[in-house]
């Protein structure tokens, strides 16, 4: 258990010896309406963005949420630094619920496509192909290819240690 706590602190947060937590990341920038529309237009989707907050929430890692930071502060008896100028404020929620929904939708679309595209193939073949298509690394490369990587909102430590924007 103690190892897990140490690992979490190392991955998500800079906790200074003085008991100050600094999750703020100057690399974070919120997705704006024009960027969303330009990405969609690039792929032939012409849609007016009515709920920008939904697109922004889809980019927020748990390490940059108010609830997560509050939990760390309470658990480790630390305080948080004030939000430095130019840094995105801590967010109310992360992408996790949207990811759950998106994974289900993506899997349904892929399964339907494969089922119709390969009518004579076995379930094993279809399952294997689905697994290779619905893959974290493939989806991360796709996100980077379309330019979403620069809009991932995460703690500074996570960004520094895992080079998350590069992966």
Where are each of the predicted segments found?
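RNase III-family endoribonuclease catalytic core
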Residues: 1-167
């Amino acid at each position: 258990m103690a190892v897990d706590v140490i690992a979490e602190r190392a991955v998500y947060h800079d906790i200074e010896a003085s008991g100050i937590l600094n999750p703020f990341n100057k690399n974070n920038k919120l997705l704006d309406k024009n960027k969303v529309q330009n990405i969609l237009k690039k792929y032939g989707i012409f849609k007016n963005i009515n709920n920008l907050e939904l697109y922004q929430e889809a980019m927020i890692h748990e390490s940059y949420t108010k609830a997560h930071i509050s939990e760390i502060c309470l658990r480790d008896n630390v305080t948080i630094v004030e939000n430095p100028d130019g840094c995105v404020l801590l967010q109310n929620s992360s992408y996790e619920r949207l990811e759950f929904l998106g994974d289900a939708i993506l899997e349904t679309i892929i399964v339907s496509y494969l089922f119709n595209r390969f009518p004579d193939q076995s379930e094993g073949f279809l399952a294997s192909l689905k697994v290779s298509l619905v893959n974290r690394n493939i989806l991360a490369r796709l996100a980077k290819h379309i330019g979403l990587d620069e809009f991932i909102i995460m703690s500074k430590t996570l960004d520094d240690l895992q080079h998350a924007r590069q992966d």
